[in-house]
Amino acid sequence: MSCSNGIWPTVSNLCGSLSFFTSVISLFPQIIETYRDKSVDGLSPYFLLAWLCGDITSLIGAKLTGQLLFQILLAIYFLLNDSFVCGQYYYYGVLHENKLATVGHEPKPLLPELVENGELLREEEDMIQGGSSAESPRSSRRRSAITAALAIAHTISTASAYPLNVGSTQSQVGPPGDGKNSQLGTILSWIGASFYVGARIPQLIKNYNRKSTDGLSPFLFATTLLCNITYNLSIFTSCRFLDNQNKREFIVNELPFIFGSAGTIAFDLIYFYQYYILYATDMQLRELERELYSPEEDSAAQLVTERTSLLSGETQT
């Protein structure tokens, strides 16, 4: 039975569509994360540079191999997205030297130092001794956070881990045709794939040295992981592969694109291992720091205090 009469074309099309959609939105979580953190301390500049070079080679390769207009436009779209991330790196990291970092996103979390100096212990004692029976929600949250911080501080270790990196699923150009341009396009495809996979190396080193995944959006890795898996599934469930008499030649032609996407899956999985297990303590400390020293909560508490004072003054008069 022909492949076109079975379920595989539908599976391939669905996987291809899902891969395309997730690749389009993959960088948005990281852009939002950087904007909220106001810091790029967790990003390696060499990673971004290699990523950008991969975009450029992919765009040139798509042009030389005569890809469709939408594929070329997609390559330009990814190039613009990555350029925007590079712009964020320049603004927050170079221009402001990460000094705009919001609470909990400093190079090192502050809570271990506070615990070490006994400041959190003193603050907890003050809360216990001076607290009223009608404890405010703000005080309750701070007290819970301090207790948790003290517990975590006793279990902090300097465990090393396999570093990881963020991944990108950029525009994938199709198999090249004939001629010198095609050969050059094939070479550029391999170079682009190597850039995308190799870009992870400096980021791995960065994460390893920091012992933290702060500043890297987990949603970026979720979308790229899903994108890379569905991209490869779309290739191997397509009729072009299933009906091909020479599957080896087909795989050889597609190899740079398979390598560029499948080569990142292992790194994405390592990231989740780091994020949820190896460096979970660091993330917990940063979360507690945001809970303890959130400017919004402090402002709200100050506003309540001011209003209470005003009401008390009006009552006395």
Swiss-Prot record:
Membrane topology: Multi-pass membrane protein
Effects seen without this gene: Perturbs arginine transport across the vacuolar membrane and decreases cellular arginine consumption during nitrogen starvation. Resistant to canavanine; the effect is suppressed by simultaneous knockout of VSB1. Sensitive to nitrogen starvation.
Cytoplasmic face of the membrane: 35-39, 95-143, 206-215, 271-317
Cellular compartment(s): Vacuole membrane
GO cellular component: fungal-type vacuole membrane
Keyword hit for Ribosomal protein: no
Superkingdom per UniProt: Eukaryota
Residue ranges of domain PQ-loop in the record: 8-71, 185-247
Residues in the Vacuolar compartment per record: 1-13, 63-71, 165-184, 237-249
InterPro entries: LAAT-1, PQ-loop_rpt
GO process terms (BP): basic amino acid transmembrane export from vacuole; basic amino acid transmembrane import into vacuole; L-arginine transmembrane transport
Record field: transmembrane: 14-34, 40-62, 72-94, 144-164, 185-205, 216-236, 250-270
Molecular function in Gene Ontology: basic amino acid transmembrane transporter activity; L-arginine transmembrane transporter activity
Miscellaneous comment text of the record: Present with 6350 molecules/cell in log phase SD medium.
Record-stated family: Belongs to the laat-1 family.
Name of this chain's protein: Vacuolar arginine/histidine antiporter YPQ2
Phylogenetic placement of the source organism: Eukaryota, Fungi, Dikarya, Ascomycota, Saccharomycotina
